[in-house]
Swiss-Prot record:
Lineage: Viruses, Viruses incertae sedis, Anelloviridae, Torque teno virus
Biased composition (Low complexity): 166-176
Ranges of biased composition (kind: Basic and acidic residues): 129-161
Name of the protein in its database record: Uncharacterized ORF2/4 protein
Compositionally skewed regions (Gly residues) per UniProt: 94-108
Pro residues bias spans: 78-90
Length: 266
């Protein structure tokens, strides 16, 4: 089942649509702006492509042998392209034209209904998207480098005098020798459950006298302690003590000293 339908345009409209399609297909692959000259040069180089034709289709020129291709005249110089990256204006949909409207200058030409297709809007949207990809819009966000430091206002009440040259930077002061610091004592971990049961006390190591000697009374001296005291009195030639906690007394040692410091100050 064939889905082909007859075209909706007349002969001039079909010719203009075909001419416009040639221009657009050429502009998609080349930017010289002259598709006729380009096709002529390609035809001189490669010739007319051969291939099977449908039954009853006439050959080029009414016979099967193609005629010799003539070189086209050089067209007039193309106008200067407009400023910016806009493509050159195509020869249709202009601001004015002849009365017949064959060039598409007026909206009342034979291809007036072609402008209602929205093809121009589609092509303009594609051009805008391509231009946006080629030239991305600059972002206003400032990128700070690693070495950049924030400038702060000086606290000095003096202001720089106008017209004076830049002042020389003062010499850097020698760095003071850092004093050694004590090692930081690690803090005890805080309980993660403050509402729970209180923390248990740490177990004590050793007897009570080692931990709190001032708060506990000392034990009474034994017979062995007194025997050691009398032995030391015999050896050191001193009298015994009444209490073992008292300091010992040595009678042969002087307890009053007369010290004279002779300092030769001038």
């Amino acid at each position: 089942m064939s889905i082909w339908r007859p075209p909706l345009h007349n002969v001039p409209g079909l010719e203009h649509l075909w001419y416009e399609s040639v221009h657009r297909s050429h502009a998609a692959v080349c930017g010289c702006g002259d598709p006729v000259r380009h096709l002529t040069a390609l035809a001189e180089r490669y010739g007319i492509p051969g291939g099977s034709r449908s039954s009853g289709a006439p050959g080029v020129g009414g016979n099967h042998n193609p005629p010799q291709i003539r070189r086209a005249r050089h067209p007039a110089a193309a106008p200067d392209p407009p400023a910016g990256n806009q493509p050159p204006a195509l020869p249709w949909h202009g601001d004015g034209g002849n009365e017949s409207g064959a060039g598409g200058g007026e909206s009342g030409g034979p291809v007036a209904d072609f402008a209602d297709d929205g093809l121009d809007d589609l092509v303009a949207a594609l051009d805008e998207e391509e231009r946006r990809l080629q030239y991305p819009r600059e972002t206003t966000k400032r990128t700070e480098t690693v070495d950049e430091r924030k400038r702060e206002r000086s606290r000095s009440p003096r202001r720089d005098a106008g017209g004076l040259g830049p002042r020389a930077a003062p010499a850097a002061a020698p760095r003071a020798v850092s004093t050694p610091k004590r090692a930081q004592v690690p803090l005890r971990a805080v309980s993660q459950n403050p509402t729970g049961s209180p923390r248990r006390s740490l177990p004590r190591v050793g007897p009570e006298q080692w931990l709190l000697p001032e708060r506990k009374p000392k034990p009474a001296p034994t017979s062995g302690d007194w025997a050691m005291e009398y032995l030391m009195c015999k050896i050191m030639n001193r009298p015994p003590r009444s209490q073992l906690t008292d300091p010992p007394f040595y009678p042969y040692c002087k307890n009053n000293y007369n010290v004279t410091f002779q300092l030769n100050y001038k």
